[in-house]
Amino acid sequence: MIPTLEDVLRITGLRVGGQAVTGTTYTSYQEPVERLLGLEVRRERSSLVQRTALQASLAVANACHQTGESQVEYMARLTEDARAMLAEEEGDAADKDLRRFLTLVIGKLILGTRGDPVGCRCLPLLKDLSSEGNYAWGAALLAHLFDSLGTSSRETGVVGFFPLLQVWAYYHLPFLGRGVARRRGAVPLLQRWRFCRDEQSLWRQVTLIHDILDTIPFGHVRWTPSVGESDAAQPWLEQDRPYFGRDIWLHCLNTVVPLHHRLVARTLGLHQAVVEFPTQQRPWERPGRSFRGIQLVTDWTVWVREQLDDWEQRGREVASEATSDEDYFRAYARRYGAQVYKGTRRPLDPEGRISLLEGILHSTIQQRDDL
């Protein structure tokens, strides 16, 4: 079970449809950084600029994270501080300041990197500021996060917009009890939550979460938490709805990763399947992993043309066969039983009877609550 494009849009408000975040990547970004931002890269063959230099150019050099402050709160404060600076400029100077701010937001927050420097691979896409809003930045965020989760060797090695995973867990796995609601009805959903600061060690936190996941009935997972939400408060949903519920390739410059929606949708008998995307580029094919480019000048609109065509055609629809939670739980239990649980403390249930009863009980409780 993983976040989907609909989750990204509802939680962050970032577009997940439209033009793919793709183009040409370079071995050096020194020339575009100097020309479009008026700054310098760290090294000649680098795609990083100093965060402090970016903030200083926007007159917000001292805007650092405060203790207990979330990324969302930090960026809101940074935006407010930079607003006055942006309002004072006109013409080319205003465009340069806006590109600096967008580079900071995209390179540090949406497509975050390890350490303090800010990535600027997105800079060529910001040359024409009038088209910046047409890109599917939310889909790029998800591709970047998937790639990070698939390559990280330690719990602390994940990069990307981690608050997405936190809020996603608050809705889909409420039994974890990790978040505190603060602004009921606010949209995007990210604004509704206050992130609790846990003083325990990271190892201890991860261990506790693993223990809970090992023993919780799968009937307590909320597959469709958006049911009951008013879409009227989020008008941007209708625009990108055609991208929901589909197997599709996600693009983030030199990272191209498949979203296997069949592995997360409420479909019957497909959760353990491996969905392979047909491709003519067999030497590249690594199911479940991303395509990451080497340090060469690469035009990704040509190099991954087949995957880009898939995006432009909005992938392939995944239809759910389950008409109710009870149907889903019954079929799931019959098909997998206790095999889907990795925890050693969960009782062996080869015929899926415990899982079946849990699913029926959960469905009955929900029906009672709806009365």
Give the predicted meaning of each segment.
Residues 1-371:
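Structural stabilizers in ordered domains
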